[in-house]
């Protein structure tokens, strides 16, 4: 029944937002129609057909079909395990014996499970009314609730049958003591979220309760900000806001569930840490930040330090109340319809007295030029290279942000020509540029590529030459024209995304800048010299970190 509910919810949502589909959503169905003669239907037609089929198919027919597609013959057993000294590997006879035992075993069918349909009783919540209302940026409506929460609403039809929200506060990981950060390493935090659940419901039960609903809600922690974000259909928005409320009012800390999560991580960690990708990440972090204790990478030591009590202590400190909090809600909703839901659920978050503020813990990239060139065992010999350039800026300017985006676009084109087409040394290099505003304005540029061992040193040299050339001589007229046209093309494409407007609202609230308007102005007024200026400012800082991971001699020889 839950599987049917999930499928019906998927096809129902697809039908409602058929008019706002993006091009990429049309590609696969058309390919299937052309090559496999699979029927191409409008989403509304497909939804009606699925409903009819589900009414005609009894559960017994599904069970019979499963039995038919899992016969005793034509069975293949695939076994994968690390090649590790002292690990006893099962034989083919062991697998056959296990299969024979299962065949004659009496396996009881799953028992029907009673799953609650409601996360809470709305009647128990007092809520709080709207204290004030005003017009906001981008056609939004701004409410201030009596509990202090600022609510920014931007209804639109750009993406039908979809609502997204972000409830955020200042603080984030910056407020967590250094000694507690192992409990908030990304894998540990993700495991806690997935297993522990919410209120009186463990994670597995929450998943079952959300069957047939298009709802995704989760608490999050960034470096300087934390909160609860989510998405849903308009029909399921009440459930989404209930969960947002519960992540503040009634979080769940279940030791048994947490232990399960940590044990799962322990089971995969020994093999995971042997992977070249893990070793590369570990060396990269060490090269960028040295032994900064606030920089945590998963390890046995990290898991040993992870503690549910530590998570609970810090979580309750961060997600305690609505003081200083703002929620942006964008998408397909009606303001009058959403009003009682906002007052009931978001208005029931505790008021609080003093807003939290982030702290600058000085997690800065190490100064100077450093090259970390190391070797690891790997089955498929290749060299992985990342070059990181960093600079502190005197001030943040959106024009610099646009110029850096333009620079990465041009570098991608140049590296495709020089590293891939001319040298044949890589499938492609990727560049990424970013300017952060807080805690201090800072620009970072990364160049990343994989290559064959014999070509690595030359490609590193060419990548540096390409960057220096762009900084010194600027882009060609053709490169600049292509780049500006691409940036201009992306503007209207971005504006049909609810997530874009969430970010624009948060940017305006945090920095007082009309991102949408100013970004377009910067693109229109961009000059080649702007690209040179930001690159030269980054290069002038002298902060350059190069990490090169090569295969060891034995692997390379093979």
Can you annotate each of these PLM segments?
Residues 1-55, 75-81, 152, 159-250, ...:
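M16 family metallopeptidases and their MPP-like homologs
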Residues 2-5, 32-178, 326-328, 333-377, ...:
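Proteolytic maturation boundary segments
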Residues 57-61, 65, 252-259, 303-306:
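Peptidyl-prolyl cis-trans isomerase
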Residues 69-71, 223, 318-320:
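Edge/loop elements at the starts and ends of beta-strands within beta-rich repeat scaffolds
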Residues 236, 334-338, 399-403, 407-411, ...:
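Short amphipathic alpha-helical segments
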Residues 248, 346, 403-414, 462-470:
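Bilobed periplasmic-binding protein/Venus flytrap-like ligand-binding cleft at the lobe interface
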Residues 254, 351-357, 473-480:
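Flexible helix-coil linker/hinge segments at domain or subdomain boundaries
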């Amino acid at each position: 029944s839950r599987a049917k509910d999930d499928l019906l919810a998927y096809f129902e949502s697809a039908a409602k937002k058929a008019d706002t589909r993006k091009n990429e959503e049309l590609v696969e169905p058309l390919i299937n129609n052309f090559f496999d003669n699979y029927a191409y239907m409008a989403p509304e037609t497909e939804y009606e057909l699925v409903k009819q089929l589900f009414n005609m198919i009894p559960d017994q027919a599904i069970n019979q079909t499963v039995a038919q597609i899992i016969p005793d013959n034509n069975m293949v057993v695939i076994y994968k395990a690390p090649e590790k000294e002292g690990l006893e590997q099962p034989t083919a006879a062991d697998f056959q014996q296990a299969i024979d035992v299962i065949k004659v075993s009496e396996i009881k069918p799953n028992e029907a499970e009673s799953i609650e349909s409601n996360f809470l009783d709305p009647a128990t919540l007092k809520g709080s009314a709207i204290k004030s209302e005003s017009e906001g940026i981008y056609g939004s409506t701004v409410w201030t609730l009596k509990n202090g929460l600022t609510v920014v609403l931007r209804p639109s039809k750009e993406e039908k049958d979809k609502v997204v929200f972000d409830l955020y506060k200042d603080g984030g990981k910056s407020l967590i003591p250094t000694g507690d950060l192992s409990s908030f390493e990304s894998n540990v935090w993700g495991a806690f979220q997935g297993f522990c659940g919410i209120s009186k419901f463990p994670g597995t039960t929450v998943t079952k309760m959300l069957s047939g609903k298009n709802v995704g809600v989760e608490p999050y922690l960034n470096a300087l900000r934390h909160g609860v974000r989510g998405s849903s259909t308009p029909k399921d928005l009440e459930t989404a806001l209930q969960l947002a409320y519960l992540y503040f009012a009634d979080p769940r800390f279940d030791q048994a569930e947490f232990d399960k999560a940590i044990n799962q991580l322990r089971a995969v960690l020994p093999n995971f840490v042997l992977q070249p990708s893990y070793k590369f990440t570990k060396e990269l972090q060490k090269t960028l930040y040295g032994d900064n204790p606030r920089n945590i990478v998963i390890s046995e030591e990290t898991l040993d330090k992870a503690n549910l009590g530590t998570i609970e202590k810090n979580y309750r400190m961060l997600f305690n109340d609505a003081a200083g909090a703002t929620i942006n809600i964008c998408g397909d909703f009606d303001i009058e319809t959403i009003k009682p839901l906002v007052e009931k659920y978001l208005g029931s978050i505790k008021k609080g007295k003093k807003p939290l503020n982030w702290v600058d813990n000085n997690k800065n990239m190490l100064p100077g030029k450093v090259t970390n060139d190391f070797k690891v065992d790997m089955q498929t010999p290749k060299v992985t290279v990342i070059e990181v350039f960093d600079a502190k800026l005197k001030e943040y300017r959106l024009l610099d942000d646009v110029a850096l985006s333009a620079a990465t676009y041009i570098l991608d084109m140049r590296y495709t020509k020089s590293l891939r087409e001319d040298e044949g040394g890589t499938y492609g290099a990727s560049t990424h540029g970013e300017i952060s505003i807080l805690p201090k304005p800072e620009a970072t540029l990364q160049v990343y590529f994989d290559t064959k061992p014999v070509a690595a040193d030359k490609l590193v040299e060419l990548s540096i030459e390409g960057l220096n050339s762009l900084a010194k001589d600027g882009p060609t007229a053709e490169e600049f024209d292509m780049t500006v046209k691409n940036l201009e093309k992306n503007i209207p494409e971005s504006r049909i995304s609810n997530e874009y407007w969430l970010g624009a609202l948060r940017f305006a609230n945090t920095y007082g800048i009309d991102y949408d308007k100013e970004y377009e102005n910067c693109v229109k007024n961009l000059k080649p010299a702007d690209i040179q200026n930001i690159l030269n400012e980054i290069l002038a800082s002298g902060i350059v970190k190069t990490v090169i991971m090569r295969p060891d001699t034995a692997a390379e020889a093979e």
